[in-house]
Regions:
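Short aromatic/hydrophobic "clamp" motif used to bind/position activated sugar donors
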Residues: 104
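Catalytic metal- and UDP-sugar-binding loop of GT-A-like glycosyltransferases, i.e.
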Residues: 107
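Short internal beta-strands
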Residues: 31-39
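A conserved hydrophobic helix/loop-capping motif in glycosyltransferases and polysaccharide synthases
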Residues: 3-8
Length: 123
């Protein structure tokens, strides 16, 4: 299962709790976490990698800091001041993630998972 989060440094702690809650209730599932990263530090990335790998799962980071400027250049009149890039990135994840990723479940960083997500993912 491919799970996507969009986060900045300030939400890493919340995202970590969400990731652990998801793993704890889906231990038998093959999980790959795709993190759309708006300036998450290398130190935080390393901590998250160690945590996720400790459970035998995968995690990949995709820097998205450049997206806002690209959007302004591509969409005339786009008022990007009203949205954070982590909000817009979830709409563009199809062009950010590798082509081999054909299905994902997007979760907000403050989501706590209390049971298996397999039925939801299989919809």
């Amino acid at each position: 299962m491919n799970i996507v989060y969009a986060s900045d440094e300030g939400y890493c702690q919340h995202m970590a709790v969400s990731i652990v809650s998801l793993i704890e209730h889906n231990k038998s599932e093959q999980l790959t976490f795709h993190i759309l990263s708006d300036g998450i530090s290398i130190e935080k990335e390393d901590q998250l990698r160690a945590m996720v790998r400790g459970y035998g799962k995968k995690i990949v980071f995709y820097p998205i800091e450049h997206l806002m400027e690209e959007l302004r250049g591509q969409i005339y009149g786009l008022d990007t001041g009203r949205f954070r890039i982590t909000t817009l990135a979830r709409l563009l994840m199809g062009s950010i993630l590798p082509r081999m990723v054909t299905k994902v479940l997007y979760l907000d960083c403050d989501t706590v998972v209390l049971r298996s997500i397999a039925p939801l993912y299989r919809l």
